[in-house]
Amino acid sequence: MDSKRAALESGDGPDAKRLDTTDDQDKEASGGDGSQVMLAKHVAPYTGHGCTPPMESYLFEPTPAGSQLLPWKTSVDLDNDAELEKPTSDKKPDTAKLSRRELAKMRREHTLRALALERELTNKPGQTPASEVLLVRFPDPEITAPMLAGLSKDIRDVVLPISVAPRYCLVHLKAGADVEATICDINRVRFGTGHLRAELKPFSDEEQAEFIDPCSLYVGNIPFNMTTSAIKAYFANAMRVDIGVLKREKRARYAFVRYASPDQTMEAFKELVDSPLNSRTLTVRYRRLRKRAGMPMVQCATSFQALQSPNGDDDNTDCKVISPPPLESIIISDSDNCSDSSGNGKEDGKRKKKINEQEREIEKLKRQMAEYGAIIKSLQFRQNSLEDTFIPDLTPKVEPSVNPTGCLLGSNAVHLMRDIKKECDYLGIPDPVPATKPTTQAQDDSQKKAKRSCFGRLFTGPFRRGTSAMKTADEYEKDDRLEELYAQLERDPDP
């Protein structure tokens, strides 16, 4: 209770704040803000046991009998609530919560406003009007499904593409051309089995505004010597700036400038129209969206087929056959339950992506194995070819001999060698052994033997001298005998 009294005396309590608002309505102030309490209107209630009523009882007015209790609200509070509700009602609707129809309607309004602003600021009184457009139709014969179905009785259905429609084209005339005279000249031209037909093609404002982007501007005639950073700095309030170079005129640049909202785009359009930039006047207009020419679509049209009617007497009764609807892709789920597989589209997409990655890795490994196999085969082929080229010649070769009979040719050399061998056997002369160069290993062995038999050389010295003398005498005798035989062979005539 004391805290409430202190709050009321200081003017910080809730009751004091509410009573502060009543001062604007010329009402009497309450005791919470330091003013006097009027006891004539604030009567203390009866306590019943002689206690002094609290000070809070003087702050409330007595409620008359039969009145209805209402919540604590003053007229000022009601006014404040109304003011709080006003900005919420004046707020623009959120585009994310709008339907497609409302969004299309809003975009149509923005494009019409942009087209009107462009016409107002770009079309001047002395400027030539825009060129007229003519629609020229070609005299192509009309092709229908019943006509094609009547070509043969075996035709069940006819599917017509869009390309069978009669052809036409749009022709833009020069500025100031005579439209009526041009139409008459075109209509007199013979084409195929008929004549061309030309007519004026009027474009409504909605048709022209359909291709306008209300948030993007086309800015042309930008100086070529300006850098990209300088051009982007010139459009400081833009969200995005795409810069390009004209194909025909290489001395000028253009830019597509995009803003956050259509209103900002209109303000920028007003500022940029006919504004100078480095001694050049900018060309500004709203960006046009082009419709991309897609692939020729096949249009499933209704066809008429001649069928036999079992209930009718006429055999040529025409029956209208409606072609089936176009097929759509069906996703088959592997789960046991018969639930719709559209909910698991993300999981299926991830699974397919993993399978595709695994297949790619397998194909990559296969390609690497094939490359390695080709390299191994090429190396084997090279090795075989090198072996064929470097095979040693195993045929015996005749080495030069000291024997002069080795120079003889033919069968005489064979007979002479036989005779020499017989004479050697008869005389007891052994076959000559070719002198070989002793190896290092033999030298080592002889050194070892010499080390082992160093003490025996003292006792075997005279004997070794006699044997060496005998060997030299025998060798001399053999050489003399061979010389005699060679001389005899030279003297004997050939048999």
UniProtKB/Swiss-Prot annotation:
Pfam families: RRM_1. Weakly expressed in embryos. Expression increases during larval and pupal stages. In adults, it is predominantly expressed in males, while it is weakly expressed in females. InterPro entries: Nucleotide-bd_a/b_plait_sf, RBD_domain_sf, RRM_dom. Residues 345-358, 472-495 have a biased composition (Basic and acidic residues). Keywords: Chromosome, Nucleus, RNA-binding. GO terms for biological process: positive regulation of gene expression. SUPFAM superfamilies: RNA-binding domain, RBD. It is found in: Nucleus; Chromosome. Residues 1-51, 332-358, 432-451, 461-495 are annotated as: Disordered. Disulfide bonds: none annotated. Residues 332-342 have a biased composition (Low complexity). The keyword Hydrolase does not apply. The keyword Ion transport does not apply. Residues 215-289 form the RRM domain. A motif (Bipartite nuclear localization signal) lies at residues 351-367. GO terms for molecular function: chromatin binding; mRNA binding; RNA binding. GO terms for cellular component: autosome; chromosome; cytoplasm; nucleus; polytene chromosome; ribonucleoprotein complex. Interacts with Zeste. Probable RNA-binding protein that specifically binds to the fourth chromosome and may bind an RNA that spreads the fourth chromosome. May be a reminiscence of X chromosome dosage compensation of ancestral Drosophila species in which the X and the fourth chromosomes are one single chromosome. This is Protein painting of fourth. It comes from Drosophila melanogaster (Fruit fly).
